[in-house]
């Protein structure tokens, strides 16, 4: 399934719907449980399944500068959501939307062309100005306006803690990409454009694709990782990737660089996706280039073994 994507309520054709609402950063396993229940309800009622999401993190508007790192770009998040439902509606989270009361939000979002018959959200769902509305508010408004509100219990991990975007960001920030993948239900990935670097990797015999990443998106802690480079032509290419500043050469700028194990071709200008499968080691400053080369060859052997396992 690949659903339609519309920007703004006014672009949506009128039709009954079962709706789920949220920012859904990362579209992790907890989000997927909510959306799956919405799809199940929509199928039962023979209406379309809809996700309503927002073009930016609410904190970017409510308290600029305090917003967290994102787990996905908007384009990637919307694409992921569209794989699950019939329609994704992207609302601009601006001052007008921010100041809507809970009831005004319901009237604007749910009672127009979406014609909501049911609304499925997580039990911690908040909405309306200053997050004044909760699941009980939504339930009461549903009774008044003719839709059913359903709260889905937060999905818990094996240790009993609720799966959350916050926990996933913490895992990524610590370089624990395996843990992040468990919580997401897939590897953490970053999208970027391949740009020219300083050519040092090429000179050393390890040409790398330097990815220009959206600075708002979370990247793992500095280190070397086993990764898969998703070429826009559909190929999934094994890669040893580094996140860091190249301290051996006195670098300062954080970079994401991928050495493709079995491919050496011109990648400049391509839009690619890099997913992180396993952490290999920390970033280290080496005393000599020869020491670095020995380590890089070892890194490649380890990455190949990890990706073939």
Identify the residue ranges that each predicted region occupies:
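N-terminal catalytic cores of NTP/NDP-binding nucleotidyl/phosphoryl-transfer enzymes
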Residues: 11-68, 73
């Amino acid at each position: 399934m690949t659903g339609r994507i519309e920007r703004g309520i006014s672009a949506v054709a009128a039709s009954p719907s079962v709706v789920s609402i949220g920012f859904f950063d990362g579209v992790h396993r907890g989000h997927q449980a909510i959306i799956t229940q919405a799809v199940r309800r929509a199928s039962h009622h023979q209406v379309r399944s809809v996700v309503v999401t927002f073009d930016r993190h609410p904190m970017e508007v409510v308290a600029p500068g305090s917003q967290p790192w994102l787990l996905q770009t908007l384009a990637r998040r919307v694409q992921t959501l569209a794989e699950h439902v019939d329609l994704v509606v992207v609302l601009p989270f601006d001052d007008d939307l921010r100041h809507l009361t809970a009831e005004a939000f319901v009237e604007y979002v749910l009672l127009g062309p979406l014609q909501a018959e049911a609304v499925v959200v997580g039990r911690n769902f908040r909405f309306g100005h200053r997050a004044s509305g909760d699941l009980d508010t939504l339930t009461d408004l549903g009774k008044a306006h003719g839709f059913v509100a359903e709260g889905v219990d937060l999905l818990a991990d094996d240790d009993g803690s609720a799966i959350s975007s916050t926990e996933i960001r913490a895992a990524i920030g610590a370089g624990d990409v395996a843990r992040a993948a468990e919580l997401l239900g897939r590897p953490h990935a970053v999208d970027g454009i391949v740009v020219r670097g300083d050519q040092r990797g090429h000179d050393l015999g390890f040409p790398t694709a330097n990815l220009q990443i959206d600075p708002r998106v979370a990247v793992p802690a500095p280190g070397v990782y086993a990764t898969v480079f998703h070429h826009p032509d559909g190929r999934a290419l094994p890669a040893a990737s580094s996140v860091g500043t190249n301290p051996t050469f006195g670098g300062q700028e954080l970079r994401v660089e991928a050495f493709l194990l079995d491919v050496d071709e011109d990648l400049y200008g391509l839009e690619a996706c890099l997913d992180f499968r396993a952490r290999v080691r920390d970033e280290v400053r080496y005393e000599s280039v020869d020491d670095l080369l020995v380590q890089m060859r070892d890194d490649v052997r380890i990455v190949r073994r990890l990706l073939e396992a």
